[in-house]
UniProtKB/Swiss-Prot annotation:
Signal peptide: none annotated. It comes from Pithecopus hypochondrialis. The modification Leucine amide is found at residue 33. Keywords: Amidation, Amphibian defense peptide, Antimicrobial, Secreted. It comes from the Eukaryota. This is Dermaseptin-H8. It is found in: Secreted. GO terms for biological process: defense response. InterPro entries: Dermaseptin_dom. Expressed by the skin glands. Has antimicrobial activity. Pfam families: DD_K. Belongs to the frog skin active peptide (FSAP) family. Dermaseptin subfamily. One of its GO terms (cellular component) is extracellular region.
Length: 33
């Protein structure tokens, strides 16, 4: 139903945000070295 679609989109968005945050941390860490 609609609710499961919303939950799925939210999960995908959360995963994408976590990946982007992790990439930003890696980038800043490599620049600091």
């Amino acid at each position: 139903g609609l609710w499961s679609t919303i939950k799925q989109k939210g999960k995908e968005a959360a995963i994408a945000a976590a990946k982007a945050a992790g990439q930003a941390v890696l980038n800043s860490a490599s620049e600091a070295l």
